[in-house]
Amino acid sequence: MIHLYGVVEELEALPPVAGVGAGPLERCRVEGLDLVVSREARDGGEVTQAALLSHANVVEELMARSGAVLPARFGHAFTDEQELAAAVRTKAAGLARTLNLVRGCLEFGLRVLGGDSAAENGSGQLSGRDYMQARLVVERGRRRLARELHEPLAELSRASARFGGASSDLRQSAYLVPRQDADAFGDRVRRLEAGHPDLTIVCTGPWPPYSFVANGEGEA
């Protein structure tokens, strides 16, 4: 099996780490794209924590050594070079565009939980029509607040992607942030936290830009 770790650019040398199953890392080129892979004798098999950690470690090492990395999620394995090349060839143009998008960037995740308990607590005394009107007011307020939280972070981001999340989530997003703006992004998150003590704001990262591999350009 051939395990794919990602598409890279400006990688001078492979990192001195082993891949999944302790296989050495290799480079190969398909349609002008530089891929980092490793080989494992056995087919697939059970997914282990060690394999997941090995994959994540390789991607992190590539992020530290490359101008751009388009990371592959764990499980992108191919039986041989021909199957790998065929899979990459069909998506080569899109991969090249997305590689350009993520160049020099890191991913940060944001989850915001905000309650509307006041509206919920009073809903028992409302008629059906009044309840629906009250809920509409609450939802409009939630959408407005979500935009207010998003816009200052989007200003520092090259792209963003929003996810559905749980019903209690006011917003759940990923932001593609240039490395030089990472500290400023963190500062803005902290200002949002200070300005909205009633909300739970959780920022994670930096991560490899997994959320933008399939999305291409986000909502920005």
Where do the PLM segments sit?
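An interfacial alpha-helical scaffold signature
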Residues: 1-220
